[in-house]
Amino acid sequence: MGTFSLNGNRSRISALCLALLIQSGGAFAGIYDDLLKAIEGDNTQEVTAILQRGMDVNTVDKSGNTLLMLAVQKGNAELVRFLLTHRARVNARNQYGDTPVLLAALKGHSEIIKLLVAAGGEINPSGWTPLIYAVFEGHEDVIEFLISKGADIDAVAPNQATALMIASKNGHLGTVKLLLKAEADTDIRNPDGATALKWASEGGHAQIVELLKEAGAEQ
C-alpha cells in the first residue's frame, strides 16, 4: 500500500522559469529573467534593485505564481521578509490553488511559515490546508507551529482524508503523536469507510496502530 505525496506536482521552478521566458517579450522579459536569476541566487540586494526599477512586487506568471511564492519555494527567508514589507500578497493563489503558506508548509520551511502567518497568511483555508500539506511530508516543527496557531486538526482534505489519516498511512510516527496530543479525532471515516487505524494497519505501521488503539481508535 503506497503513501500519499504531492512532490510529483510541486517541483515546477525550472519549468516555470522556462515558461516565463517563452511567454514574455522585450524589455519585460529581460527584467524578469534578471529577477528570476536573482531569486535563484538568493540575491536579495539584486531583487530589491530590480523592483525599484518598476517591477510590480505582485507580478505573476501564466500559472499565477508570484515572486513571494518563488522565494518561499527557494527557502529564502530574507527575501520573503523583504517582499512582505513591500506588500506582496500573502494569500494569493496560483492556478494549482497553492498559497505561499501552503508552499512553505509543504517544503517544511518553519521560519518562513512563521513570517507568512504573522503577515496574515491563512491557516485554515478551504480545500487543502497548510497542516495537511505539512503532514504529507512529516514536517513536525511546522505541524507543531500550525497546531499552536489554531489549525483545524480534523479538517477533511479534497481527497476525503484528515491529517491523522494521512500521517497514519504514510507511517509518520512523530506526526501521529503530535496529532493525537492535539486530540485529533481517531474515528473519522472517508466515503469508503476507511479510518486512520485501518490505513495504519494496512501499511504495516505497527507502532502507529498501537498508538491509535491506545487512543481508542476503531477500525
Q: What is each of the regions a protein language model found here?
A:
Residues V60, R93, I123-G127, V156, ...:
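Ankyrin-repeat boundary/linker signal
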Residues E46, E78-L79, E111-I112, D141-V142, ...:
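Conserved ankyrin/ankyrin-like repeat signature
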